[in-house]
Regions:
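Aromatic (phenylalanine/tyrosine) cluster motif
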Residues: 10-16
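Short amphipathic alpha-helix that is part of the acyltransferase structural core
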Residues: 28-95, 100-109, 175-220, 257-261
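Intrinsically disordered, low-complexity, positively biased terminal segments
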Residues: 29, 34-37, 45, 183-430
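GNAT/GCN5-related N-acetyltransferase fold signature
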Residues: 81, 92-93, 115, 236, ...
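A structural microfeature
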Residues: 88-89, 163, 244-245
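Conserved acetyl-CoA-binding loop-helix of GNAT-fold acetyltransferases
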Residues: 112-115, 121-134, 271-282
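Conserved GNAT acetyl-CoA-binding A-motif
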Residues: 129, 134-148, 286-296
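Conserved active-site alpha-helix within GNAT-family acetyltransferase domains
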Residues: 137-142, 147-166, 298-314
Length: 430
């Protein structure tokens, strides 16, 4: 750390900004272009808000109504590349926790990656991402995730798609015949119900793969704020009196053909809870003939909707990258039935500390990483991302994609067993 808002660049691929000695350096390739002499990588301050907002407008058309355009606070790390006093590129690293294999995995949620129009095609996006990943590792993140806008760039940086956040619409007629089931009672949520809602979500996250935990500073909401963020939250109460599911929803404006009833979360621990919450959404059909839902992964909602007409209106691809191989493999949970040793070799230019030979020992739902011999499989950083996320990806598929080479049939069998499990999902856009 050079000062309160200055940090050194990290690693051999920090081509811009400060050298490892902490002194600012020139980039001869940029000098030759005549457009840029030197850039500095540092954290953003409130004084940078105008430049950051201008860049966001250029890149994404924001600010979006109802969302803060520039926030600083616990759990949010904003970084920039500066050409003198001019902000040339920026990123945001949000402190998240992903749940993989039932265990928490510290995550850098990357967003707002942008380069000013006057500084594009100079490699600044790659440079700032490389430095941001190094800083994320320094604060303890072991994986990084993002919603892609430039797939070629992010794949070249070692990210690979593991999930999709899908927004879909369907006519209420597709829900015809659904009723609140006798074993379920619906009621409106109050602030006191927020812990039960969080418990429902966390159980589903533990049973899934890659969902965010919705804990930590970036999800710091009071019980009242959690419930009041929507027009309504409806609970599905089971026979024992437990909260078996909930739906958070917004009624929308007006009524008639163009009115839409939007469901943000529709989560249930039982089929009765899910079906009953769908029936609640259908009950608005006289005034809102269209229902909008958000889903991801193997959502049982798909299997409980009786009619036709489901149309995906927005699909956001979710990518993952392994930032710290050893810690990422050791933090996540693995199938309890998997036991064995896998020798893995990795070449990682963006996160060079991952490069090397690794011996992964699986036992009892956990894994340990030790120095390896190089006698097993070779895996690319993108292959490593898919390996860590799991979800039934197979070694054969990784080989066809050029992400896996070498090793033996026994290695492939062990890989397939380790990668078995729930399909990755994500329900939070950032």
């Amino acid at each position: 750390v050079v000062g309160p808002h200055r940090v050194a660049s990290f690693g051999p691929f920090a081509r811009f900004g400060r050298s490892e000695s902490g002194t600012r350096r020139d980039n001869p390739n940029l000098e030759a272009s005549g457009n840029l002499q030197r850039v500095e990588f540092r954290s953003l301050t409130p004084d940078d808000a105008d430049g950051s907002l201008r860049m966001s407008r250029d890149a994404f058309g924001v600010p979006i109504a109802g969302h803060a355009a520039f926030t600083l606070g616990q759990g949010i790390h904003r970084w920039g590349l500066f050409d003198g006093r001019i902000l040339a590129a920026k990123t945001v690293d949000r402190e998240y926790i992903s749940v993989i294999g039932g265990r928490p995995v510290t995550t850098a949620g990357i967003a707002g990656v942008a380069v000013a129009p006057e500084y594009r095609s100079l490699g600044l996006a790659r440079s700032i991402m490389t430095d941001t990943l190094a800083r994320a590792r320094a604060r303890g993140a072991v994986i990084s995730t993002l919603f892609r806008t430039a797939p070629a760039l992010y794949r070249s940086l070692g990210y690979e798609q593991v999930a999709e956040l899908v927004t879909a619409e369907l006519p209420v007629s597709a829900l015809a015949g659904l009723r609140v089931l006798p074993r379920i009672r619906l009621r409106r949520a109050e602030a006191a119900d927020a812990p039960a809602m969080r418990a429902v979500y966390m159980q589903l996250a533990a049973e899934g793969s890659c969902l965010l935990s919705r804990t930590g500073p970036c999800f710091a909401r009071s019980n009242a704020e959690l419930v009041d963020a929507f027009d309504g939250v409806t609970l599905a109460i089971g026979e024992s009196g437990s909260v078996d599911g909930y739906a958070s929803w917004d009624r929308g404006e007006g009524y008639g053909p163009g009115a839409i009833f939007t469901v943000h979360d529709l989560l249930g621990l039982t089929s009765d809870a899910v079906a009953s919450l769908l029936a609640m959404a259908a009950s608005f059909g006289a005034v809102t003939p269209t229902v909008r839902l958000r889903t991801s992964g193997a959502d049982p909602v798909h299997w409980l909707i009786p009619g036709a007409g489901w149309t995906a209106t927005d699909v956001r691809q979710y990518l993952l990258r392994v930032v710290e191989l050893v810690a990422a493999v050791e933090q996540r949970g693995w199938p309890a039935s998997v036991s064995g040793v896998l020798q893995v070799s990795v070449q990682d230019q963006v996160c060079p500390w991952n490069t090397g030979n690794h011996r992964i020992v699986f036992d009892g739902g956990r894994a340990q990483v030790q120095p390896g011999t190089g006698s097993g499989v070779q895996m690319t950083p993108t292959g490593l991302a898919l390996f860590l996320a799991g979800g039934g990806v197979t070694s054969a598929a990784l080989r066809r994609a050029g992400m896996l080479a070498g090793g033996s049939p026994a290695d492939d069998l062990l890989l397939d067993a380790a990668m078995a499990g729930p399909r990755p999902a994500i329900l939070d856009y950032f």
